[in-house]
């Protein structure tokens, strides 16, 4: 993984703001990726880089991004479908700025997104991770739901015990490159496209706290989420969330020991009882969420773990 001064696309920001590059991972969402990329460029500093890591099955997404990619700030990298965490690691390795922001290919950042992220990092070199709000676009609440996460006020966690106060999700997330390097990047056995299906964002924040970095939430940074799920699809989505989070919590216990018990109890109960869906009439049954969480926790407890890096070991082929 590169040092902060490693070669890559140049990046600078207006006076008073830290240099920030953006990584967008995408797979088989040509229209969404184009919308996200255009919104990112509209919200980005003139000298920020945007790296799109495309794990699509064909060239449709790259063709949709052809006009966007004519902007000298944009690079599109075709990559094998190894999952979201791997895509984000590749994207970070392909940038140079000391801060890297992420959103998803079904999201669009609001104006001022990067300025808000820069402000959240400014003046405190101990902050390693920043999360913002993920606001659902308008949708038919009778037909399904769109996952969302609203930050109502600034919060900072500096210890594992405070992790339940800053949940955050990776659709509006930024990291300090030095933290990414220190942690060995995102755990590629977690997240969308992996066997454990989710949790790479939560896991990164947990490991950052264990390494002594702070995790901050800011309501000033936000993205709009267009990822509507019909109820049947939503059940599978939430099941995936629970499996990933179960694995993350099991890993937390293995890495931190008894110090992890309190935050595990708080976070697990919050997600199992509430989950990311606010419509009580259609929420997947608590038993389904609990079963998925426990399945993920059992897998995470038994999976080979590289304790030095804090990553699950890749399965043997």
Predicted regions and their residues:
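Short, well-formed alpha-helical segments that are part of the catalytic scaffolds
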Residues: 28-42
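Glycine-rich, basic loop-to-helix element that forms the pyrophosphate-binding segment
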Residues: 36, 79-95
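A conserved acidic beta->alpha catalytic loop
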Residues: 39, 46, 54-63, 107
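Short aromatic/hydrophobic "clamp" motif used to bind/position activated sugar donors
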Residues: 100
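Conserved donor NDP-sugar-binding/catalytic core segment of glycosyltransferases
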Residues: 112-145
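Short, flexible, basic/aromatic active-site loop/helix in glycosyltransferases
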Residues: 132, 147-166
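Acidic donor-binding loop at a coil-to-helix junction in glycosyltransferase catalytic cores
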Residues: 168, 192-203
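Non-catalytic, C-terminal membrane-associated alpha-helical segments of glycosyltransferases
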Residues: 237-243, 254-317
């Amino acid at each position: 993984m590169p040092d902060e001064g490693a070669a890559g696309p140049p990046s600078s920001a207006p006076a008073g703001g830290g240099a920030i590059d953006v990584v967008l991972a995408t797979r088989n969402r040509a229209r969404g990726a184009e919308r996200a990329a255009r919104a990112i460029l509209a919200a980005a500093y003139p000298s920020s880089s945007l790296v799109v890591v495309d794990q699509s099955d064909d060239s449709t997404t790259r063709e949709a991004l052809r006009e966007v990619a004519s902007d000298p700030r944009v690079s599109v990298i075709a990559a094998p479908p190894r999952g979201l965490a791997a895509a984000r690691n590749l994207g970070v390795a392909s940038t140079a700025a000391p801060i890297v922001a992420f959103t998803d290919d079904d999201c669009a950042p609001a104006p001022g997104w990067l300025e808000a992220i820069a402000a959240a990092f400014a003046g405190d070199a101990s902050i390693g991770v920043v999360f913002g709000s993920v606001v659902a676009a308008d949708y038919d609440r009778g037909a399904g739901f769109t996952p969302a996460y609203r930050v109502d006020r600034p919060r900072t966690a500096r210890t594992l015990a405070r992790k339940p106060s800053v949940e955050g999700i990776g659709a509006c997330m930024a990291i300090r490159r030095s933290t990414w390097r220190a942690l060995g990047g995102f755990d590629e056995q977690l997240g969308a496209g992996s066997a454990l299906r989710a949790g790479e964002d939560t896991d990164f924040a947990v490991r950052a706290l264990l390494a002594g970095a702070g995790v901050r939430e800011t309501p000033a940074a936000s993205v709009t989420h267009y990822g509507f799920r019909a109820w049947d699809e939503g059940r599978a989505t939430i099941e995936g969330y629970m499996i990933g989070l179960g694995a993350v919590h099991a890993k937390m216990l293995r890495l931190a020991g008894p110090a992890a018990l309190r935050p595990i109890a708080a976070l697990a109960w919050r997600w199992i009882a509430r989950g990311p869906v606010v419509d009580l009439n259609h929420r997947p049954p608590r038993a389904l969420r609990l079963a998925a969480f426990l399945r993920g926790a059992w897998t995470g407890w038994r999976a080979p773990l590289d304790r030095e890096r804090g990553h699950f070991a890749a399965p043997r082929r």
